[in-house]
UniProtKB/Swiss-Prot annotation:
Principal location: cytoplasm
Gene3D superfamilies: 3.30.420.40
Subcellular location: Cytoplasm
Entry keyword annotation includes NADP: no
Keywords: Acyltransferase, Cytoplasm, Iron, Metal-binding, Transferase, tRNA processing
Protein name per its UniProtKB record: tRNA N6-adenosine threonylcarbamoyltransferase
MF terms in GO: iron ion binding; N(6)-L-threonylcarbamoyladenine synthase activity
């Protein structure tokens, strides 16, 4: 079985082909970061229009990369949510039209389930059950995963997601979009403990997150450090970035440890854009070693949005006979807990 995957939920156009026998055989990606940089963030209308321009050429490029024709595709998977409604509709419409024209089944895939499945594309994939930390610009969730579709939300952000807090704080530091990535690079040059940020919601029971207060704390710290010209010196910027990142990482470590101890699980899967953060990876690895457990995450190119994770997730579900009807429907808000469970599917 060969599945074409299409991802258009936000500002990346991703197309990939997953082959049951050979694994991932094509992966094409176009990022809109440069286009949105002038605006300091994603402009939904521009994102949608660019997906219209790029999706079909990327499908053609993926088929060429895999040395396949359309007649050799057995199904199409597409991101149907959560995400920007206009961007989602582009991918969904193209996927549904191609599935009808090629006479193959189509499947609407949950974007965050795609991220959750991304580590399955690696050489040493995790086995169920495990705790999943989904951490991106739009989501920060701790999920108990018993199998495909068997999800229990243990905790999530009650305000800003971690990635959103990174981006907003980076912007306060005068960094260009995407500011979160630039903040992490700045933090590497920071002096530890010059500034100490709070670790929100770690002084009480529970697994929920709150990151909006860290952004406010950063703003107040920045304002207190401005010189007479209203500027921050470079080392102070690095030190504030370091303190902010350390607070986020510490908070996540504490919550992950609680989730593992609460469930008795020994495997942790981390996925989503922020899962590429070097410090977070290093400290989670140290924590899991102390707990005699193991942490799994996708390679950096599959941390951000991509078509490979959608193609793979679509393959798993289409193989079990799941499919979507002919209607073009997207879900900008879509709880993962409503997804169909694939019974007794404990190894993929």
């Amino acid at each position: 079985m060969r599945i074409l995957g299409i991802e258009t939920s936000c500002d990346e156009t991703g197309v990939a082909i997953y082959d049951e026998q050979r694994g991932l055989i094509a992966n094409q990606l176009y990022s809109q970061i440069e286009m949105h940089a002038d605006y300091g963030g994603v402009v939904p209308e521009l994102a949608s229009r660019d997906h219209i321009r790029k999706t079909l050429p990327l499908i053609q490029a993926a088929l060429k990369e895999a040395n396949l024709t359309a007649s050799e595709i057995d199904g199409i998977a597409y991101t149907a949510g959560p995400g920007l409604v206009g961007a989602l509709l582009v991918g969904a419409t193209i996927a549904r039209a191609l599935a009808y024209a090629w006479n193959v089944p189509a499947l609407a895939v949950h974007h965050m389930e795609g991220h959750l499945m991304a580590p399955m594309l690696e050489e040493n994939p995790p086995e169920f059950p495990f705790i999943a930390l989904l951490i991106s610009g739009g989501h920060t969730q701790l999920i108990k995963v018993a199998g495909v579709g068997e999800y229990e939300i243990l905790g999530e952000s009650i305000d800003d997601a971690a990635g959103e807090a990174f981006d907003k704080t980076g912007k306060l530091l005068g960094l260009d979009y995407p500011a979160g990535v630039a903040l992490s690079q700045l933090a590497e040059k920071g002096t530890p403990n010059r500034f100490v940020f709070p670790r929100p919601m770690t002084d009480r029971p529970g697994l929920d997150f709150s990151f909006s207060g860290l952004k406010t704390f950063a703003a107040n710290t920045i304002n207190a450090q401005l010189d007479e010209n209203g500027q921050l010196n470079e080392q102070t910027r690095c030190d504030i970035a370091h303190a902010f990142q350390q607070a986020v990482v510490d908070t996540i470590i504490i919550k992950c440890k609680r989730a593992l101890q609460q469930t008795g699980y020994s495997r942790l899967v981390m996925a989503g854009g922020v899962s590429a953060n070097k410090q977070l990876r290093a400290e989670l690895a140290t924590m899991m070693q102390a707990l005699k457990g193991q942490v799994y995450y996708p390679r950096p190119q599959f941390c951000t949005d991509n078509g490979a994770m959608i193609a793979y997730t679509g393959f798993i579900r289409l193989k079990k006979g799941e499919k979507t009807d002919l209607s073009v429907s997207v879900k900008p808000r879509w709880p993962m807990t409503t997804l169909l469970k694939l019974s007794a599917h404990h190894k993929v």
